[in-house]
């Protein structure tokens, strides 16, 4: 008669043969009873954090929801059970966690196999039997050669069992992460085993970064290290990346996993490759340990047990293959099997490791659920943080740095640049000018939007007086400040540009000129008649080299040139004095 564990293992074998019907990846791992409970605990804590702000959940609530979830998924009656609060959110978060970790639990595989009718009569399992097995109510005899004693006698035996469980969990976590790079539970167990300096702070930063990029934690760490090591200037990691503090530690961890992957890809024999993988992990865990340490001895026993299991798996596979292919020529592998998920030379090793992990998934669940859920005391013996404590990482603070560091650094730099920037020198006495000159100009001069567009009517056009009262002749664009404020040092270009005017002139009209020694303005008869009576008159000078033309074209293309040539009161006299 087939044992119950063997029936569940046959379910998983059926899943491996028809994996495209179940999952998108051949490397999908099976979540056993203990890991199902741990995943539910983390999912409930995450939902509680969203609703109440605290990443925590009581053991009684976990066990109540666990019992209700098993009945719900197996389709069993739960009339006498009350639905837990936020059960729908707990269930959704649980399935989301498994999907993001590329895992399927035993119940999902069972339901899929039953729906597809992939089981024979002898392999069928009743839902109530599966419920009793997962919940731990069924008495299951361990017949897979486990190194763990069934009933520890005294405290010393209990301590040795805890050490053995911890060592076994470390090995299976390394193998699971090697096969399934999305397994966040496996990563949390071995990220800092042995001590690499990647404690809770590093795990917190990795978790936040992985959620921002919607990647698994291990793939996020791998992507960061690859960017640091091989990225050029264009794709280098940011200087303000919080993971830069842990570059060395993360690099050591990623390089070790890469070393295990190289063993899988380079050694074609799965027996040799499996033994070398176990030996590499063993030497890695034993660093700093002496022969008399309990952990050292536990690692030795676990390696021997796993090595024996790998050999038994390979032998059983050869027996099945020999029995099924007797007298039949070997066929070529299917097209989708080649290079699907791994290099072809390492496929046999990966398949052996998957079978090893599947056998561990069907092992009997832990009887002491409280010890499984809250194992802080047990893990403190090895200086390890529990999975729940790791995932209880606080949210990143946003109050200490409201703006990015680059903006906070750039702001004072820009302020210094603004202080150092000065206006261009307008004359040799510009350093003696007051800062109120710009205010005076803004008060006495009109902007380009305030001055109407230049027209070309008849020479004698009457303009509105309000433009003159504000200090500007809209036609000739002559500013009136009460005194002459024109620059004497104009070159020929400015004189030529000043010949433009808003109104057309007659060829016989006289040019307006300025006399620096007089305060009166004279005109010719034509220009005088075009001005209103209340406008101030300008006086011209007979010296053409000191000519100042304040008339700018209607399109005001030379507005900047005119603004640079404006002088304050008394500057023209000082300039003439120093010329003498």
Swiss-Prot record:
SUPFAM superfamilies: P-loop containing nucleoside triphosphate hydrolases. Residues 525-565 are annotated as: Disordered. Gene3D superfamilies: PCRA, domain 4. GO terms for molecular function: DNA binding. The keyword DNA repair applies. GO terms for cellular component: chromatin; cytoplasm; nucleus. Keywords: Cytoplasm, DNA damage, DNA repair, DNA-binding, Nucleus. GO terms for biological process: DNA repair; negative regulation of double-strand break repair via homologous recombination. It is found in: Cytoplasm; Nucleus. Belongs to the PARI family. Required to suppress inappropriate homologous recombination, thereby playing a central role DNA repair and in the maintenance of genomic stability. This is PCNA-interacting partner. It comes from Gallus gallus (Chicken). The gene is PARPBP.
